[in-house]
Amino acid sequence: MAALWKLPIAFICENNLYGMGTANARAAANTNYFARGDTIPGFKIDAQNVLIVRETMKWAKQFCLKEGPLFIEYSTYRYHGHSMSDPGVTYRSRDEIKHVRDFRDPIMLCKHMLIENSWATEKELKEIEKQIRSDIEKDVAKLLNDPEPTFEDMYSHVTLTRPYIRGVTHDLTQHDYQTS
């Protein structure tokens, strides 16, 4: 429908290379997920690089507004398993994980680009990190001292405006039409 109606939408598939307990190549005959959009054009990007992601999405927005839907596969990496029962090291080596952390980590790559292009100095980045850590510590301390929320708080600041649907009452469980 998106292709038929040329909807301005980008479908994003985050490919972290592993399903639960197995590599993609062992679970799919075609791991080029971007090609599965049928008539929707698609491509793959290196989502470990934040600048590539930013520039791709700026371009994708303009493309979708003019041309219609687009399918983008984000090639990224999952450092950890899915759960306690999936330690994430039975189907890949610790060396592989370490290699990605050391050479392909998005935060590390971004820092390197900022410094290499003279957009920031190492000192400036350390100050930013220090400020972020301080802000987080303050927020955590505040939250730990806040009272526990009550059951009634669960509904605070929650609003629902139900759309009018002909033949349906507001509780969405009973029809308001008459039978004869």
Give each language-model segment a name:
Residues L144-S180:
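C-terminal intrinsically disordered, low-complexity extensions immediately downstream
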Residues M1-N145:
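Glycine-rich ThDP/TPP pyrophosphate-binding loop and its adjacent helix/strand module
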